[in-house]
Every structure is written in structure tokens, then in C-alpha cells.
Amino acid sequence: VKEIYVTLSGNDFCEVVDEPSTDQLTDRLADLGIRVPEGHRGEINLGIQPWFDRVSKIIERGFLITIDYGYEGDPYYQNRPNGTLQTYWHHTQGATPYTNVGKQDITAHVEFTSVINIGRAFGFQPLTFMTQGQYLKNLGIDGWIGNLRRSEYVPQEKEANLFGMRDLIRPDGLGAFKVLIQYKGADLGGRDPLPTGIPLSEQHPPVLNDRHLELALARYPDSLSGFQSLWPWGSTPEDSATLSEPEDSASNGV
């Protein structure tokens, strides 16, 4: 395992590959039981442990919900030979962090297995790990969609709201975000804290206002690549997952 360092060559940034600056990089891969393929380039997030250290001092009893895009440890490293590092400049996706320095967004996916494992060490037990699409379906989003269809909104307004709500559960869009719920110091008493079929049909669905991006009018494309070019906050969803252990993201090269 090597680490990628960044230095200057004249007026240009350049990368230098050398020995890891800390044993934490190799320790993380060992903890995951992963041997990365030769030539693999990826990220390791060393900020998870200090983050949990801070959170554990704040939350003595309760639930921690993490919603983000990412993978579990094995597919995170085995299926992404070039890692997950991405940049966004004027809503355009790229992979070169050495241009538009200080102006473009730089992001990487979450490696959820380490989030689960490190969370356990700080007393946070995993309750569930699933896609955002499944999570919202469990909460009853289909009831809201049904209410919108039967509502008295004008057709254009109705379709705009249906478009946005369905997009939250699209498997090739926001529905592929992951939802991890962990708990600490809570006595569940054998009860299911995540009941399904909540009767949201009795509630009025939330609707768009002037602060929302109206995807239908923006001609939201069907492809994930098109979605990424419209997404204004520099995040991109991927894949889906079932209950298991999570992963993280980061800036250290492997």
C-alpha cells in the first residue's frame, strides 16, 4: 500500500507516490479483511473514528441516522479500480482535483462497513442499513404518492410534485442513497423500531415551494449521468444495498 502525496512542479500540481504517512491506512484495510488489487487507486477516510468520538460524547442515548451515497467495504474497494473521488464545477462532474482549486467541490463515497464497525466500538449498534428508496417505501411514501394522484392540484403542479417525490425512490437516482441507522443506550424491548406500512395516506403530502428545484421543468433526465450534472450540491448517488455492514470515504490514497 502506498500513499499519494501532492506537491508542486514549477507552477503545476503533481502527485508523488510514497510510503504511507500513517499505519492507520494499512490498518483500515486489514480491519476490513480486504486486499486491494494491484494498481488500485482509492480513498480511505481516517476521519470516521474522531467523528464518532465527538458524537459519542454528545449522544448518551438515542439514534444516529446517516444518509449518503456509498458502498460496503468489499464492493467499495474491489469494484472501483479508480476509486470514488469526483469533482463538481458548475454542476459538471469531473475527476481532476487539481483544477479550479478552491472553487470546485471535491467528494468521495462513504465506505459504510467502517462506519458500522467503528460505530460499534463507540457503543452505536447498527439497527438497519438499506437504500433510501426502500427506507421511504417502508415509511409509506406510496401513500403520499397516492394522495397526490387524487389531489385537486392542477395537472402541471400535480405532475411536478409526483415527479419530485418519485425521484426520491428511483433506484438509479436518489433512491440509491444509503440509510444507516445506529442506536446507543436504547432499550428496544423487543419492539420493531422501524414498522412498515405507516398510514401516511391519512396525512397531506409535502409539496414543492419556491425553494425547491422543480425537476420536471428542468427536464430531469432518465440517466444517472444526467442526474449528476443537475445535482447542485456535489453529491452523486450510486448502487443499492441490503442489510449488512457499511463503508466510508476520504482523501488518503491507497
Residue ranges and their predicted role:
Residues V1-T26, N79-Y88:
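A mobile, often basic/glycine-rich helix-loop segment
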Residues L25-V254:
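Long, Lys/Arg- and hydrophobic-enriched amphipathic alpha-helices
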